Each structure stands twice: as structure tokens, then as C-alpha cells.
């Protein structure tokens, strides 16, 4: 059976929708694009008119009632932001906006500026009302940024939408976050083949290929977005929410294999910047996730449960 695909640029990412050819496949692609545009309007921290930005604009003013999808992602993000030693913090928006790494107006904030902004990045300042589905940022100038989670969450929503249409197989690649569902009918073992980027080399160079089925692969790396300041130093985009500066780490890339793409987002962010020992121990302790760690000097570490998926 022939694969058909549609690629669009949205939310600062290239998005691939891959389905097997079937009746009305082009209309299905059109409907998915409409959904993606709707989710951009809901989750984006870079669109001043998005539903998320309505929360941010009302920081220190009043609670904002939001769609259940947005509320659920914020609720999930807050839980994992408050976890011990987590490097995920959805309240880090002011720090991200200060650096702007990945945008044309990127800069290096002053230390005084960063220290002042850190005072309004405590996720405890996010007040949630489950019955009303309202979100209130209790400090002025607070900002939620869901950039570490939204792509995976949206990919999962799209997969659920396609399954509800009765579509049995497909693949979504949302800016490098890959989620598959159903059998890969074009492969004898019915598994999809996903290349894992070598973070120490140019894009398209893989450290391995993974065989996956009804699973997601999410990779985070310091190679993705960088900025060279007037001081001549190069800064990557993965910020440490505790210091306000790019995380200092021996890790160049971290890949998480999970059932849900949002879980891959959560754990790549929670773990990136931890020691290799901590990351590998966590991967062995949590049965729902597997992973691959690549260091800046090119060493590769695999969790035990992922080894039978690796094609080198």
C-alpha cells in the first residue's frame, strides 16, 4: 500500500503527516492542517492573540477560563515542573523571552535582569481551578511557555483524531517529534523505522535507526538552536530554570521512546542537564520510557529496554 504525505510549516517547525493512500486522503490532510492551525492559536507563546497568551496578558490581574486541552497541558506541566530535580518549568516564559534564542532578536540578558525574572518563574504561582478550567498567574509579568511540551501533546491529539476517523496506521512528525500508530504495512515486521539524529554532526546523520510500533520518539539537543553573543560565546536554547542560563551539560542529545509523545517531551526536558548516571538510572526505573543519550564527545548510551529496537 502506498504512503501519502503532506508537509507544512507551522509553529516554527516543519510538520509531516504520513498516511496510507485511501479514499479522501487529501481531504483528511486538509482537516489535519486546520486542526494544527487551531492548536497553534491555542498553545503558542509566540502569537500574541493565542489562548495561552490571554493567560499571560492577565498575569497578576485575573484568572482566565480556557479550553480543556490547554488546561490539561498546563495542569500536567505544572505537576512535572514541581517534581524534585526537574529541569522542566512551564513558568520560565520570562527567561525564554529575555534570551529569544532561535529568533532574529536573540541577545544575552544581563545577570541583574535574569535574577529579577527568576523571582516570577516559580510554578507554584500558577493557580488552577479544575472545576472552572481557569488559570491564574498570581504575579505580574509572569508567562507560561509550553514550548517544551506542546508539540508532543498536539501530535497525540492529532493521532487520536485520526484514529477516531477509523484510520488504522500513520505517522506524525511534528518538528522532529515523531509519533506512530498502527502497523507499518510497507515493512515486513510492520514496524516503522525512525532515524535518530547524531547531535554532534550535521542534520541527516544518524547514530542509529529505531524500530517502533504504536510509539513516539522525541529528541532534544543543544544542536537545535544556538546564538553567538557579542562576547563571542555560543549559547544553546535549553535553559536551566534554576539559573536562567543555558544548562551546563555533557549531554549533546537525549532521545526518549514512549507511548505518548507528550511523555517524551516531559522526560527529555526533565532529564536534560542531569548527569548521565541520573538519566540512565531514571530510564531503568520508569518502565514507560526508554532512551538514548549522546554526549558532546560522541559517546552513546542506550537503556536496556531499547537495545532490541536498534538498527545500527
Stretches found by the model and what they are:
Residues 1-312:
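Mature catalytic core of soluble alpha/beta enzymes
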